């Protein structure tokens, strides 16, 4: 099963299955001298962890174990291997799925490609979103390394089901959304999202949503003009996330309804620099980052595992039947998915930053390491619960 690695210079390989002993990641290409601790990784993992309000009831501790690549809280330049053990597995929930592939899931395509006898039906196996633990671990490393360029990445849930954000949002509000149980950047929206989740849970159903990720101060010129355009690289990265069904940046599909005179973003002087008036392009022009905020959005489909009975085929007799999926599943995968999107944006940007020479390939100086650590600590402090002013 190829296709488990991402990146060229900052190369990430994830491994493990939903109900296997562990999931994990190997990160190759991290320069030496980057300050890095288990706590740095846990900070990001906490926001995709199950067992919290409004997400999957699977109570995983998600404690990362660093196996290699770090000594005295600094990277050594060798591959970083990290595992997270699966400690709350109930495979008995999936016995029915063994013979009845779930609508909306990868079950049947996996059986068709790899063979029924080779299919790990427990929790979705390799196709499970549990795989994204490795992405978030690598994303934490990438986010910290990007602090060398003072590049910050944060996301929020722009819509959930029929409810959506219809006003401007500040980057500070997006940072604060990390502590919202439904990743809302506004209190009033949080209440609407919570009501929807409660409704879906009662009905045995689920909702989809749109995640938006904003990158502040991205290095200028990341990406390559032809096949490795930044928009193409981000699209591939984000579309590889389980349950993601669409991608856009800047004005996205809305631009198709506009005139050129409306869609063209005028070039102006801004803070004594050359810039763009509205950032309609979402920080990417000609396949290159232009220094404006990098703004991407992606659509998550509703969670496929739902209690409502749905038609399927019993593989034992090839007769039509019904399945009602039991177990512990997210009523909206988009909530925890926001952190995964942030991670994939970080992995894409850090790889291109290294390719462009913005981040050193071999090692960080002691001064650079100290700068990274100071900025990381400021980032962690900035991610705080919403204030009453956001009501």
UniProtKB/Swiss-Prot annotation:
Which GO molecular-function terms appear in the entry?
chorismate synthase activity; FMN binding
Q: Which reaction does it catalyse?
A: 5-O-(1-carboxyvinyl)-3-phosphoshikimate = chorismate + phosphate
Q: What is its EC number?
A: 4.2.3.5
Kindly state which keywords UniProt assigns to this record, in alphabetical order. Amino-acid biosynthesis, Aromatic amino acid biosynthesis, FAD, Flavoprotein, FMN, Lyase, NADP
Q: What cofactor requirement does the entry state?
A: FMNH2
Q: Where does FMN bind?
A: 126-128, 286, 301-305, 328
**Cofactor remark:** Reduced FMN (FMNH(2)).
Upper lineage is:
Archaea, Thermoproteota, Thermoprotei, Sulfolobales, Sulfolobaceae
Which pathway?
Metabolic intermediate biosynthesis; chorismate biosynthesis; chorismate from D-erythrose 4-phosphate and phosphoenolpyruvate: step 7/7
| One BP annotation, GO | aromatic amino acid family biosynthetic process
Q: Does the keyword Transmembrane apply?
A: no
Record family assignment: Belongs to the chorismate synthase family.
PROSITE patterns, per this entry? CHORISMATE_SYNTHASE_1, CHORISMATE_SYNTHASE_2, CHORISMATE_SYNTHASE_3
- Where does the UniProt annotation place the signal sequence? none
What is the source species? Saccharolobus islandicus (strain Y.N.15.51 / Yellowstone #2)
Q: What is the uppermost EC class here?
A: lyase
HAMAP family hit by this protein: Chorismate_synth
Name of this protein: Chorismate synthase
- State what this protein does: This reaction introduces a second double bond into the aromatic ring system.
Keyword Lyase, does the record have it?
yes
Gene for this chain: aroC
The UniProt record gives the binding positions of NADP(+) as 48
A GO cellular-component term linked to this record: cytosol
